[in-house]
Structures are given as structure tokens and as C-alpha cells.
Amino acid sequence: SYDLFPNKTVLGNITLAPTLVQKRDKAEVEKEAIALLERVGLADRKDAWPHELSGGQRQRVAICRALILHPEVLLFDEVTAALDPEMVREVLDVMLELADSGQTMLIVTHEMQFARAIADQVIMLEDGGIVEQSDDAEAFFTNPKTGRAKRFLHTFECDRHRRPAETP
């Protein structure tokens, strides 16, 4: 359900917290919510109910609901875990756009190709402890320091999947 309120439309889910908690003007919040929905490709679903949406659409609504609060950092915990492959791409595309726009995100993921494409810093955790930490994400993926990280990354063949170089 992505913790969407089943008795509220997409627009109602996004506008609830800013109007109720932050006491922001409803008309301004709705305008911003629609702009966020346009940003994630869901403006045409603003009047839909959560049960009418796919998993990927619900996840994108949840992202809009977080963004409308103007957070300094967005937290994502296995954001694609329950999604089918088509929906995974939709959500990852939104997250990539957020990163490109400068949004700071803390992402827990097993999507190693995506992590490599988007990360500035990487912390690999296992059993609640830090296996390896790198302030240089590319160095982590190309030359991990620990044997455990090397074995893990080899499983995903991360060295074969790189983000295309940007052209000047």
C-alpha cells in the first residue's frame, strides 16, 4: 500500500501533511502537488484512488508525498523490493531525476547497477555492521577494499554496468 491512505485520492494523499501539519495554503499545496505529479509522470492520475494504481505508481505517489514537505534528505529503504521489473524502472528513473536535480538521498538497496549510477558515497552493511565505506562510489565499485565487498560485487558484475559518460 506504500502507506497511502485508501480513503484519499492521489492528490489528497500528497496534500494532507502540508496542509494539516505545516498549515500551508491548500491551493498552493495542490498546485505544487500537481507539478510533482507531472514530474513523476502521474498528473493524469491525481483523482485516482490508491487501489486503482500499480505498485510503481503508488511508490511514485509516496515519493511526491515526501517531496512536497521539502525534506533536506529523502530516505529510501528497498524502494523497489515489491515491484515487478517494469515498475522498478519507473521508480528508479524518478530517483535518478531527483539525484540529477541535487536532492540528497539515503538509499538502502540491492539494485547495484542503480547504486553505481547514482551514488556519491557508499556504505556496505551486513548483519548490522559496516563492511566497507567509501566517499568515492566509483572506487568502491571498481576497487573494493574488503574481500567481502569484492565477493558481493562480483555476484552482481557491477564493473560491466556503468552510467554513460556525460558529453560536454
Protein language model features and the residues they cover:
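A short, proline-enriched helix->beta-strand linker immediately N-terminal to the Walker B motif
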Residues: 68-72
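A short, surface-exposed alpha-helical micro-motif characterized by mixed small hydrophobic
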Residues: 115-117
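Catalytic Walker B motif of ABC-type/P-loop ATPase nucleotide-binding domains
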Residues: 74-77
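H-loop/switch region of ABC-family ATPase nucleotide-binding domains
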Residues: 109-110
